[in-house]
Regions:
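Hydrophobic/aromatic-rich transmembrane helices and adjacent perimembrane loops
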Residues: 189-192, 273, 318-321, 443-470
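Transmembrane alpha-helical segments
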Residues: 104-109, 222, 226, 312-316, ...
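Active-site lumenal/periplasmic loops and adjacent helix-entry segments of GT-C-fold
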Residues: 102-279, 315, 505-506, 533
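Membrane-embedded, hydrophobic transmembrane alpha-helices
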Residues: 1-91
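Transmembrane alpha-helix segments characteristic
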Residues: 297-308, 323, 345-350, 416-438, ...
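Hydrophobic, aromatic-rich transmembrane alpha-helices
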Residues: 282-290, 323-335, 400-421, 467
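Extracytoplasmic
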Residues: 473-627
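Membrane-interface alpha helices of multi-pass inner-membrane proteins
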Residues: 264-267, 286, 299-314
């Protein structure tokens, strides 16, 4: 039942809030609430997983995790200073930024995630692809109860090298009895509060001004480059923004425009990025206070917060390491080299190093070393080509993609205060690494590093612009100048968000949903299905069952060598034999429109003559091979 899921999440968020209050007892609610959400989601990822490794991802493990977290919350509440309302003069500015984006985000989540329209599931442009994969991972973990999970998109033995804790935070609620939509969305709501709130608080802490924090917030979440210029030539081209498939001012590959809006193209469709930033942004806030404001006691809370980060979003963990290295160098250069100063850094590195190594050794780290097309050299992100040449001029590429923020980075850097420059030094380390090393088969995915560099750049540019315009005495001219800069820096993203809000795509039919429900109720949890390699395969996405060969758009970009599975899928449809079926452990065979459209010589008659028809609905038929 959904009520148990709400209570379960509330326990973790309450514990997170108690930790936030204990870490920063003098902070107002505008800090404690988003920071508490970050801690709460981190606990939700880490604690149930610890029990599930031993007991399986089942109800006993989840209940034990909740009991431990509830006990922690009670202990913290009893042993912390009594709760009192702390003056919070910046709260209004924060919520004035967060609430408008929260409304837009809630609407997009409503229309994009398993949105039931006339019996079918609909989605939006950005979720048409990735969400099908995330839904399948979430469901598979819940039905199999295995952690670390099996890799359900391929038959045979394959490592699950994807950061799966961004999925278990929803699998928890499926095990507790929630429906798929509720389970998918519940942890995302808390994560968005953390991402939006702590990005603002990071900017406020680093820049020392609520006004600068507001500008940095909008430059990051709604900033864009000059891609809108390509759509100003005619009314037809401009209208195409709102009707085409990925023809927006922030995602227009025909003109090498690829710097997407972080809300609609990263946070909503890509759960790893959302949950990674949910932990990373509060971590950066604590890093600043720990290092630059000399609150060394915060290392314990920082370590606790980031324990699950590598298996939530590996790119965010790497970004944090590089920023911490820059801050560590600052500590060595600019502060006394005493035990009181250096020991907290050593303890923080030791705790995270040991825990992260255990987490990553047989998962994402192993996959990065022996996966297909993973760790390799490559120049200039998506602008670089395999022959070493560039599609566009290096600086021209970033100018047209990032726009005003990129143009002002150099003056903003020299305008910044020394501590701000040191922090941005971590961003420069991220930029250099991401421009020369690729960590996955898809070069594009290095943007998950580049956006953290960009975040730090937005802080510096916001400070520069506010200081520049503060020197303009005439308030109307000051306001006009700021508005003009905001228009230039954000117009493309405004159009992109508008396009996303209007987008509506059919994803799964009523027959697909009915078939998935039947499979969920009647098929073995460890059953293997022979299906087409459609990325929308309902057997995997909706029922969470393992399939012989999933879509190449998923498995290739996870670094998997799936040649054998792909060939076996083709052979078992076109020239089936019982030996091959047994070899691959096939339990069920699906024939549907995807099979007949992608495999022209699919031989259903062979299966119909030998095996019972297990399920039929509309154009879909499933034959049971074993039993």
């Amino acid at each position: 039942m959904n009520i148990f899921s709400f209570v379960y999440l509330a326990v973790f968020l309450l514990a997170g809030f108690c930790i936030a209050r204990r870490a920063l007892p003098q902070a107002g609610l505008s800090v404690s609430i988003p920071l508490g959400c970050g801690f709460g989601v981190s606990l939700l990822a880490f604690v149930p997983a610890c029990f599930a490794v031993v007991l399986g991802f089942r109800l006993p493990a989840l209940l034990l995790a909740a009991a431990v977290v509830a006990a922690l919350a009670v202990w913290l509440a009893r042993h912390s200073t009594p709760f009192t309302r702390v003056p919070d003069p910046d709260a209004a500015a924060l919520w004035a930024c967060v609430l408008p984006l929260a409304v837009v985000t809630l609407y997009l989540l409503h229309t994009h995630v398993l949105h039931l329209v006339d019996g079918s599931y609909h989605t939006g442009q950005s979720c048409y692809g990735d969400m099908a994969m995330h839904l399948g991972f979430i469901k598979n973990i819940a039905v199999t109860g295995k952690l670390p999970p099996v890799y359900p998109l391929l038959g045979g033995e394959h490592r699950f090298g994807y950061p799966f804790l961004c999925e278990t935070v929803s699998s928890v609620f499926l095990v507790l009895g929630a429906d798929a939509r509720t389970a998918y969305l519940l942890p995302m709501l808390a994560a968005f509060i953390s991402v939006y709130g702590m990005m603002w608080q990071l900017a406020r802490q680093v820049l020392g001004s609520a006004g600068k924090a507001c500008l940095a917030f909008w430059l990051f979440f709604m900033g864009s480059g000059f891609g809108f210029v390509y759509f100003l030539g005619s009314a037809e081209a401009f209208a195409g923004i709102f009707t085409g498939f990925y023809t927006t001012p922030t995602n227009y590959t025909a003109e090498n425009i690829v710097w997407v809006n972080p809300i609609v193209d990263l946070l909503i469709p890509q759960r790893a990025t959302l949950f990674g930033w949910c932990v990373l942004f509060p971590a950066l806030y604590l890093v600043w206070r720990f290092c630059m404001e000399e609150e060394t006691r915060l290392w314990r809370y920082l370590a606790l917060l980031v324990l699950p980060l590598p298996l939530m979003h590996t790119h965010s963990a790497l970004a944090l390491v590089l920023i911490c290295l820059a801050c560590g160098v600052y500590t060595l250069v600019c502060r006394p080299r005493t035990k009181a100063v250096l020991a907290p850094w050593g303890w923080f590195a030791l705790v995270c190093g040991v825990v992260w190594l255990v987490e990553m050794w047989n998962t994402v780290f192993a996959q990065s070393l022996d996966g297909q097309h993973m760790l390799r050299l490559h120049l200039n992100w998506i602008n670089g080509q395999d022959d070493g040449t560039l599609k566009d001029n290096y600086f021209g590429f970033y100018i047209k993609n990032i726009g005003l923020v990129y143009l002002l980075l150099i003056p903003a850097f020299f305008h910044a205060k020394p501590k701000q420059r040191w922090l941005y030094g971590g961003g420069l380390a991220i930029l250099v690494l991401a421009e020369f090393v690729v960590f996955q088969p898809n070069n594009y995915d290095n943007n998950k590093l580049l956006y953290i560099w960009h975040l730090l750049g937005c802080l510096l540019v916001a400070s520069l612009l506010m200081d520049w315009f503060s020197k303009v005495r005439a308030i109307p001219w000051r306001a006009l100048g700021l508005c003009l800069c905001c228009f230039i820096a954000m117009f493309g993203s405004v159009l992109t968000v508008g396009r996303e809000a209007l987008s509506d795509y059919w994803q799964w039919s009523a027959d697909d949903i009915a078939m998935a429900d039947y499979i969920d109720d009647n098929a073995e949890t460890d059953a293997v299905f022979l299906t087409s390699d459609s990325h929308l395969c309902p057997v995997f996405s909706l029922a969470g069952r393992r399939i012989l060969c999933g879509s190449g758009s998923f498995v290739y970009y996870h670094g998997m060598n799936y040649t054998a599975e792909y060939n076996a899928m083709q052979q078992l449809y076109e020239n089936p034999d019982e030996v091959s079926l047994a070899q691959w452990g096939i339990d069920y065979v699906l024939f549907d429109s995807y099979v007949f459209s992608n495999i022209q010589n699919a031989d259903e008659s062979w299966y119909a003559a030998r095996y019972p028809l297990w399920y039929e609905n509309g154009g879909s038929r499933i034959y049971k091979i074993n039993g």
